[in-house]
C-alpha cells in the first residue's frame, strides 16, 4: 500500500527576504490544513483530491501568495485568475481561466472536472459555472490588496522608463524587490490507493494584458497527473513554461529514461532555462512516491509532510523542519 504524500509550492521568483516569513507561515498552514484530508485522524483512508483542493484553497486565502486574495493585477488594475486540477487514474481534469470576483478558482476547477462535460472553459463561461455551482460573487476589487496595487504602480513606472518587467522572464521581475504580492501555488498528493492528484492556481503576472492566459490552466505545462508516471505542478514565467511544456517533459523523463522525480525535475527545469531563458520551478511526486523539488529562479517556497514532520524551504539546499503536531 502506498504511503500518503503531500507536497506543495508557493511560487517561484525573485522573492525578497522580507517575504520569506509570510511564505513559510502560509506553506505550513496549508500543509496542516490538508494533511487531515489525506490521512484522517480516525485511521480511515483519506483522499488525494480533497487534500490537494484543501491545500490550494488555504493558499488562495493568503495574500502572501498570488492566487485568490492577493492575486496580481492586469494593466487595467483587475484580478483575472486561473486554475487547474487533474486526477491520475482516469486522467480527469478541470481547467478554468479569466475568473473574476470569486475566492477559490481551484474549487471551480473541481466542479468542472466532476460535474460538467468540458475540460477547459474561460471568461464568461467559467464565471457562470462558478456562480451557478455555489461560489459567492465578491464585491468588485475584494481580491485586490494594497501590495498588488503597489506592484502594478511599479510596473507602470518602469514602462515609462522604457523597461518592460514582463520580459524579465521570472514570475516576479528582478527590479520589483519590494513586491508584496505572491506567486502561483500548487499541490501534488498521493493517497493510500496510489491515486495522484495535482492542483495549481494563480493570479498570473503583474501587468499582463486583460485576457492573457498563462501556463497554470494548461495540462502538460502547469499541471499534470498520471498514476503510471507521477504528478507535477509548475510555477514561474508562464510564457516560458508553456513553450517548454514543462510538466509533461518531467513526466516523460520519468517514464522513458527511468529517472527519479528529483533527477527529472532538475534536468527539465535547467534545460527549459537554457533553451528559452525564462526561469521557473516544479514540484513532483513520482509514481513510486518519491519527491522532486527543483527551480532555476532565485527562490521557490515549498513544503511537504513526512513521518509526522513538516519539511519546508525556499532557497538552495536549505531545509527547515518542525513537528506536524
From Swiss-Prot:
It catalyses: L-asparagine + H2O = L-aspartate + NH4(+); Cleavage of a beta-linked Asp residue from the N-terminus of a polypeptide. Its EC number is 3.4.19.5, 3.5.1.1. Substrate binds at residues 212-215, 235-238. Cleaved into an alpha and beta chain by autocatalysis; this activates the enzyme. The N-terminal residue of the beta subunit is responsible for the nucleophile hydrolase activity. It comes from the Eukaryota. InterPro entries: ASRGL1_meta, Ntn_hydrolases_N, Peptidase_T2. It is an enzyme of class 3 (hydrolase). Pfam families: Asparaginase_2. GO terms for molecular function: asparaginase activity; beta-aspartyl-peptidase activity. The active site is at 184 (nucleophile). One of its GO terms (cellular component) is cytoplasm. Belongs to the Ntn-hydrolase family. This is Probable isoaspartyl peptidase/L-asparaginase GA20639.
